[in-house]
Amino acid sequence: QDGPIPP
């Protein structure tokens, strides 16, 4: 999952 928070 892309984003500032890792999956």
UniProtKB/Swiss-Prot annotation:
Chief location bin: secreted
Keywords: G-protein coupled acetylcholine receptor impairing toxin, G-protein coupled receptor impairing toxin, Hypotensive agent, Pyrrolidone carboxylic acid, Secreted, Toxin
Tissue: Expressed by the venom gland.
Any single GO BP term: regulation of blood pressure
Domain of life: Eukaryota
Residues the record lists as Pyrrolidone carboxylic acid modifications: Q1
GO cellular component: extracellular region
Record has Transmembrane as a keyword: no
Subcellular location per the Swiss-Prot or TrEMBL entry: Secreted
GO MF annotations in UniProt: toxin activity
Function: This peptide shows potent and long-lasting antihypertensive activity as well as a reduction of the heart rate. These effects may be explained by the agonistic activities of this peptide for the muscarinic acetylcholine receptor M1 (CHRM1) (EC(50)=0.25-0.31 uM), since these types of G-protein coupled receptor have been demonstrated to be active in the blood pressure control.
Note: Negative results: weakly inhibits angiotensin-converting enzyme (ACE) with no clear preference for either C- or N-domains. It does not potentiate bradykinin, and does not affect angiotensin-1 pressor effects. It does not bind to type-1 angiotensin-2 receptor (AGTR1). It does not bind to the muscarinic acetylcholine receptor M3 (CHRM3).
Protein family per UniProt: Belongs to the bradykinin-potentiating peptide family.
Protein name: Bradykinin-potentiating peptide 7a
Species of the source: Bothrops jararaca (Jararaca)
